[in-house]
């Protein structure tokens, strides 16, 4: 973007006259910056910033509210569907609560069991119930402030007859999701020269290389990390917990992600962890782009142009090359490709195009 001087939109006849059928929907003409006569000038431009969600997340129920609502749903089902009275429905709902929520392994209130967490007198969660863990799935998959920085070096100058502009750029942007981001290198050379009174030529070459790391899950699939993290019940921990509610560490002293596939299956999103989906699985797109624009202009109105006076002819040639390579890896141990033994996919597309007009 720092190399762009101006943009012009061509529509209808003007676009068709230059590009024929390819310009039927209009053409956007981008003019890049060119060298200026004078001493060589070197400039450096850097920007930095942070990215975050543009909209505040919705308020979510907490652990006690979730248990309370689950209990009420069970109790009301027994009352309206099975004809139980209030007391009998409450007792049955309390008895069934652990089976619905995944057993004591997923009970964060270690001073009560699932069968006693509801006060039978009030039908509400015990007031002195204390939680052994309270982990936010959305916080676990996101960066609070994703850092972005961009740098541009440009060299500009020239003589009366030859002008030049060179630029180098670098962009690094962290994604809002952990282990995602975008990185790009770009370069440009723009040279214009007046060969003699009746001939001018120019060359504009641009190169870029970019890598995008992203989450390959989308839609409303359970393996979509945005979807599953928002819908995961707050009682379920991100990391494996012991009977005392504390983290179970591996041999190296690191916390272990809970995939819901232990001795007791997690009722919700079993064998999947949104954080693990971003750590264990990989997806990236690498793109190489090269562009070349050159022109050769003949003719002049100058008296010194000799035989070329009054003749005007301009030849324009453009060449574009793009190579896009995408790789996706989904691990064999957890997630929606575990049953298939994992998944490795590679996709490559290379395109070339050219434009010539006069």
Model segments located where?
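Residues embedded in well-ordered regular secondary structure
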Residues: 36-178, 216-219, 246-248, 252-261, ...
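Extracytoplasmic loops and strand-loop junctions of Gram-negative outer membrane beta-barrel proteins
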Residues: 10-12, 133-139, 171-174, 271-280, ...
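Active-site-adjacent bridging/hinge elements
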Residues: 4, 125-131, 162-167, 262-272, ...
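Solvent-exposed loop segments that connect transmembrane elements
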Residues: 221, 254-257, 261-263, 333-356
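Periplasmic N-terminal accessory/gating domains of Gram-negative outer-membrane beta-barrel systems
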Residues: 1-17, 49, 137-142, 146
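Transmembrane beta-barrel strand/turn architecture of Gram-negative outer membrane proteins
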Residues: 3-6, 23-54, 159-246, 277-328, ...
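Eukaryote-specific, cytoplasm-facing alpha-helical/coiled-coil scaffolding segments in long proteins
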Residues: 71-73, 320, 324-325, 341-343
């Amino acid at each position: 973007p720092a190399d762009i001087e101006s943009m012009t939109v061509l529509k209808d006849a003007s676009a068709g006259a230059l590009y024929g059928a390819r310009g039927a929907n209009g053409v956007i003409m981008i003019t890049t910056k060119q060298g200026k006569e004078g001493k060589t000038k070197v400039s450096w431009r850097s920007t930095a910033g942070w990215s975050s969600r543009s909209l505040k997340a919705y308020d979510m129920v907490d652990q006690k509210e979730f248990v309370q609502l689950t209990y009420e749903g069970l109790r009301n089902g027994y009352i309206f569907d099975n004809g139980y009275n209030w007391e009998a429905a409450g007792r049955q709902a309390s008895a069934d609560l652990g089976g619905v929520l995944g057993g004591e392994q997923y009970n964060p209130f270690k001073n009560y069991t699932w069968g006693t967490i509801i006060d039978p007198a009030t039908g509400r969660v015990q007031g002195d119930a204390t939680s052994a863990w309270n982990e936010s799935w959305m916080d676990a998959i996101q960066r609070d402030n994703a850092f972005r920085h961009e740098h541009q070096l440009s060299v500009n100058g020239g003589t009366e007859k030859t002008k030049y502009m060179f630029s180098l750029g670098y962009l690094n942007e962290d994604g809002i999701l952990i282990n995602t981001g975008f990185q790009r290198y770009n370069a440009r050379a723009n040279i214009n020269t007046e060969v003699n009174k009746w001939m001018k030529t120019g060359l504009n070459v641009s190169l870029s290389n970019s890598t995008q790391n992203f989450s390959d899950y989308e839609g409303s699939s359970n393996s979509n990390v945005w979807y599953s993290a928002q819908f995961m019940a707050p009682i379920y921990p991100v990391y494996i917990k012991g009977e005392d509610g504390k983290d179970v560490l591996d041999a190296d002293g690191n916390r272990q992600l809970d995939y819901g596939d232990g001795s007791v299956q997690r009722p919700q999103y079993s064998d999947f962890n949104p954080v693990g989906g971003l750590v264990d699985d990989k997806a990236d797109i690498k793109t190489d782009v090269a562009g070349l624009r050159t022109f050769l202009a003949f003719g002049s109105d100058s008296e010194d142009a000799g035989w070329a006076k009054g003749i005007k002819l301009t030849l324009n040639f453009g060449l574009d090359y793009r190579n896009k390579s995408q790789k996706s890896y989904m691990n064999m141990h957890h997630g929606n490709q575990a049953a298939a033994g994992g998944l490795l996919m590679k996709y490559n597309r290379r395109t070339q195009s050219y434009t010539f007009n006069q």
